[in-house]
């Protein structure tokens, strides 16, 4: 099933690149005219508002359920909780798993974001600026982590990092999976940074980089003074996405983190869920905090 998903995803991506990736309009000058707002009056305005409110409420239902469950004392057989309390939030933050898990998640997500920014910029540069054969294949391979289920990748990392295997050094002496989790998070979120960097390179004018090189600037100085300032907004957006999704990564966290002192925040939420009595309320409260 995974092989079928990979083949279909790669084929669809390459087809979309072939059909839609030929345009070079990103470097064209921006139009000077300003777009005008169109005010919808009467029933059109009310209908548009109703559609947006309906979509917003539908998308907010899971979040609303978590918030209500985190503050409920007794909720059975009714639409809303009969009583609300803030004790679950205090108890969740006071649990011995919570603060270390937040620190671990910040460490793992920050490391993954740095890896994604470095690799993402390098891969995007090869895809957009180089003339190496196989650039389209590299572009497709980078997007594959979005098509592979997280549990499949997690079990693959777990198998490769077992004692006696080639990548067993990624697990510390005391079983610390920090390096393994950083790599797993980085691979899962690398497509976001690559796509952001590719978009930035396509929109920036290559003539600026060529002018700097022709005037004697070394490649690293050109990158620092010309390319990176032009790509800063794109890299910032990609880095934020990579960090945010890595903070709340579920599949890799549940499989690769097995000791309580190494739990990221998502594994801590799962552990609180299994607490006897008010486990669901505590897990929901920590989910709201997260």
What are these language model-derived features?
Residues 30-40, 73, 77-86, 91-94, ...:
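Membrane-interfacial helix termini and adjacent extracytoplasmic/periplasmic loops
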Residues 12-27, 111-142, 206-208, 219-226:
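Transmembrane-helix boundary motif in ABC transporter permease subunits
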Residues 41-52, 122-157:
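Cytoplasmic-entry segments and transmembrane alpha-helices of multi-pass inner-membrane transporters
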Residues 15-54, 133:
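Transmembrane alpha-helical segments of polytopic membrane transport and secretion proteins
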Residues 51-54, 97-109, 147, 156-193, ...:
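Loop-to-helix entry region at the N-terminal start of transmembrane alpha-helices
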Residues 5-7, 12-13, 50-63, 144, ...:
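Transmembrane alpha-helices
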Residues 1-7, 39-44, 70-77, 84-100, ...:
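Interhelical loop and adjacent transmembrane-helix boundary motif
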Residues 36-39, 130, 204, 210-231, ...:
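Short helix-to-coil transition segments within interhelical loops
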């Amino acid at each position: 099933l995974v092989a079928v998903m990979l083949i279909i995803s790669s084929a669809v991506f390459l087809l979309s690149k072939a059909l839609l990736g030929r345009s070079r309009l990103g470097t064209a000058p921006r139009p000077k005219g300003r777009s005008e707002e169109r005010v919808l009056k009467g029933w059109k305005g009310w209908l548009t508002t109703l559609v947006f409110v309906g979509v917003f409420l539908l998308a907010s239902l899971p979040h609303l359920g978590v918030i209500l469950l985190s503050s409920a004392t007794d909720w059975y057989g009714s639409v809303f909780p009969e009583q609300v309390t803030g004790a679950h939030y205090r108890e969740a933050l006071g649990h011995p798993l919570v603060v270390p898990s937040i620190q671990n998640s910040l460490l793992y997500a920050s490391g993954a974001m740095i890896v994604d920014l470095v690799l993402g910029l390098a891969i995007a540069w090869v895809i957009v600026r180089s003339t190496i054969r196989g650039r389209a294949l590299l572009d497709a391979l980078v997007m594959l982590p979005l098509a592979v289920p997280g549990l499949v990748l997690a079990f693959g990392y777990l198998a490769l990092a077992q004692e006696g295997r080639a990548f067993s050094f990624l697990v510390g002496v005391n079983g610390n999976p920090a390096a393994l989790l950083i790599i797993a998070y980085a691979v899962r979120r690398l497509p976001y940074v690559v796509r952001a960097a590719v978009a930035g390179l396509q929109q920036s004018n290559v003539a600026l980089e060529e002018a700097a090189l022709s005037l004697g600037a070394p490649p690293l100085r050109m990158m620092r003074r010309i390319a990176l300032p032009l790509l800063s907004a794109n890299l910032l957006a990609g880095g934020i996405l990579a960090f945010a999704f890595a903070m709340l990564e579920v599949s890799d966290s549940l499989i690769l983190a097995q000791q309580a002192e190494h739990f990221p925040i998502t594994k801590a939420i799962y552990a609180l869920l299994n607490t006897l009595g008010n486990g669901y309320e505590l897990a929901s409260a920590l989910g709201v905090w997260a």
